[in-house]
Curated annotation (Swiss-Prot):
It holds the Pfam family tRNA_m1G_MT. Homodimer. GO terms for cellular component: cytosol. It is found in: Cytoplasm. It comes from the Bacteria. S-adenosyl-L-methionine binds at G111, I130, G131, D132, Y133, V134, L135. Keywords: Cytoplasm, Methyltransferase, S-adenosyl-L-methionine, Transferase, tRNA processing. The lineage of its organism: Bacteria, Bacillati, Mycoplasmatota, Mollicutes, Acholeplasmatales. It catalyses: guanosine(37) in tRNA + S-adenosyl-L-methionine = N(1)-methylguanosine(37) in tRNA + S-adenosyl-L-homocysteine + H(+). The keyword Iron-sulfur does not apply. This is tRNA (guanine-N(1)-)-methyltransferase. Specifically methylates guanosine-37 in various tRNAs. GO terms for biological process: tRNA N1-guanine methylation. One of its GO terms (molecular function) is tRNA (guanine(37)-N1)-methyltransferase activity.
Amino acid sequence: MIIDIITIFPNFFDQFLTTSKIKHAIEDKRVEINIHDLRLYTDLKGGKIDDTPYGGGAGMLMIYPPFHKLINKLKTKDTYTVLLSPQGNVFNQQVATKWRDEIKHLILICGHYEGIDDRIQNLIDEEISIGDYVLTGGEIPAMVITDSITRLIPGVINEASYMEDTHQQGLLKYPQYTKPDEYLGMSVPDILKSGHHEKIRLWRLEKSLEKTYLKRPDLLVNRDLTKEESKILSKIKKNLESQ
C-alpha cells in the first residue's frame, strides 16, 4: 500500500515514521509512506499557501492551486483521495479494515487555518474525521489513520493480536492480566489460570459483552448477535438488574 500525505509541516512526521511498527513496516516494504510539502507547489512568494476568504470572515483559507498541482501529479487509477476534516465521515476500525483491503494508493490531505478553498471537492473522494472536535490541522488525524491501517497490513503485527482488538470484532476487548498473580490484594481471576480453554473463551466473551454493554451500548444496537452472545447478554442484563 502507498500512502501519500500532503502537509505544510513535513517535519511533523519525522518521529512518527522512524519509530516502532511504522518504521519496521516501511523498512520491510509492507507500506510506502511519502510526505509531500505543499509549499513547494505554490506560485506565491515565500511559499505562501493561504489568503483571505471572499465575502469576509475570520482567519485565512488555504488556496486551491497548490493542491491541484500536487494531487494531479500523485494520482493514478488506483488512488483514493481523502480530505481530513471535522465535517467528514467518522473514521473507525471497520473503515481501516476496508481501506486496507480495497485501497492500493491513499492520499491524505492535511488542512490548516480556517480550511481549504472549497474547490478542493473536485479532487477528493471522501472527507474523513477522527471525531467530533476540531484540531489545528490534519497532521494528527493523518498519523492516526496511517497507524491504524498499517498495523492491519499482514506481517506488520501478528494477526492474532489485532483480531482480538477492541472494535475489530465490533466489541470492546475483555480485561487482560499478567504477572504478578497477586498485588496489594488484587488477584488475577482464577479462571484465567485454569488452563481450560473453553471456559476461558466464554469468560472473555462474557466480559467483552459486559464491557461493551456498560461503556458503548451503541455498538450492540446494529450488531447481529449470535445465539451464544444473545444468551450471555441476557444473563449480563439480569445480573446487573438484580444488583
